[in-house]
A protein has these predicted regions:
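Extracytoplasmic/periplasmic ligand-binding sensor regions of membrane-associated signaling proteins
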Residues: 178-264
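N-terminal Lys/Arg-rich, disordered targeting/topogenic segments
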Residues: 1-14
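Short regulatory alpha-helical segment in sensory/regulatory domains of signaling proteins that mediates
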Residues: 70, 88, 116, 120-129, ...
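GAF sensory/regulatory domain recognition
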Residues: 138-199, 292-296
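Solvent-exposed, extracytoplasmic
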Residues: 117-122, 262-306
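Extracellular/periplasmic juxtamembrane segments that couple receptor/chemosensory ectodomains to their
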Residues: 242-270, 309-352
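Short, hydrophobic-rich beta-strand element in sensory/regulatory alpha-beta domains
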Residues: 80, 122-123, 130-141, 285-291
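Juxtamembrane extracytoplasmic/periplasmic/luminal helical "stalk" adjacent to the first N-terminal
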Residues: 12-113, 130
Length: 352
């Protein structure tokens, strides 16, 4: 007799593996969690809070950059030591009969003793300050009566990389304006736009000569020279030059009140752009260095005239188009510009 093993019947297939069942359960749990997170974000207004955080970060970045730029400007415009030194040299040369105030601005030859004596002081100032240029322009007459395009004795020195270690022989400096005799004696190269004198272009308040000089001249030099100090509110180009710049200048005033010229410093757009890195701003942001006649920056509408702007494409530049920033909300830093909504932050530069 044979013993037969009982025949086992196969269990019916359900169509779902254990792995599929577990995966389905996990997906179901994940879906529930997503719904809960979405509800929580909506209930706690997480989106608006993130936007507010982004605006706060932008405001902090702009404020920090503003303070840094302000320190550069303040250092640049502190010219008291240079002014006192040149005034002392001028008075000494007057006492010795080497120069005359009546002819000082008539030619480079008449002014050469002073230009030669002042040149080392200008070079020293250029070395110790984070500026790209320094200049001295001599004039003893009313600019309102001076003919346009008349020539004035001047020195205009430039250092394209003021943060680099200086050359012992001044090989890193160039003369933009200076008498040929001075160029030869100091063995400093000339810029492509070099000229022995500077041309009076009658730019009025747009230039760096007229505003400080004429204010002191008309006022009888009743204030300190620094009180007439002036930053150009528009960028400029020295004739024949390709380097866009802004400048600070103040008058030269002798102890008897005689106004006989201006001294000043230059900041090239290239150098300022390096100190306005748009890479630190999110979403292809841009820095503007601008001026406004609006007294309160918290006003509902700001009319700004850009002086310079940074470029994320690697090129600095000026911006001729004015900006109108309208306050979008009393509680945010959103502004309307060109019918599009932008986030902007405005921080003042206290220069005077």
């Amino acid at each position: 007799m044979q013993n037969r093993k009982p025949h086992r019947q196969k269990a019916p297939q359900t169509g779902h593996s254990i792995f599929g069942t577990i995966l389905f359960s996990l997906l179901a749990v994940l879906a529930v969690e997503i719904l809960l997170l979405t509800f929580a974000a909506h209930a706690t207004r997480l989106g608006p809070q993130l936007n507010q955080n982004a605006e706060d970060i932008l405001a902090m970045q702009v404020d920090n950059r503003s303070r840094y730029l302000q320190s550069i400007f303040h250092d640049a415009q502190e010219l008291t030591s240079l002014s006192d030194t040149i005034n002392g040299l001028t008075q000494q040369l007057l006492d010795e009969g080497e120069i005359s105030l009546s002819t000082l601005d008539s030619s480079s030859d008449a002014a050469y003793p002073l230009l030669e004596a002042a040149a080392p002081e200008l070079i020293s100032t250029l070395r110790i300050k984070s500026v790209t240029g320094v200049f001295l322009i001599l004039n003893t007459h009313d600019l309102d009566k001076r003919k346009q395009d008349s020539l004035l004795p001047a020195i205009y020195l430039r250092d394209l990389d003021p943060d680099a270690a200086p050359s012992q022989r001044n090989a890193d400096l160039t003369f933009v304006r200076a008498p040929a005799q001075l160029v030869q004696s100091l063995s400093i190269a000339t810029d492509n736009s070099w000229s022995p004198t500077i041309r009076y272009r009658a730019l009025g308040n747009r230039g760096f000569l007229y505003p400080p000089f004429q204010a002191a001249y008309k006022d009888g030099a009743s204030l300190a020279a620094s009180d007439y100090g002036h930053w150009t509110s528009r960028s400029y180009l020295v004739p024949g030059d390709t380097h866009e710049a802004i400048a600070y200048s103040q008058p030269l005033i002798l102890p008897d009140g005689t106004v006989y010229g201006v001294i000043g410093v230059e900041l090239l757009a290239d150098y300022l752009w390096e100190n306005l890195p748009c890479s630190e701003l999110q979403n292809n942001g841009t820095y503007f260095l601008a001026v406004t006649d609006t007294e309160e920056l918290s006003a509902s509408e700001l009319q700004l005239r850009p002086v310079l702007r940074s470029h994320c494409d690697g090129q600095p530049g000026s911006a001729d188009e004015s900006l109108t920033l309208r306050l979008h909300s009393a509680h945010t830093r959103r502004y309307l510009f060109s019918n599009d909504l932008y986030i902007a932050s405005v921080s003042p530069l206290d220069l005077y």
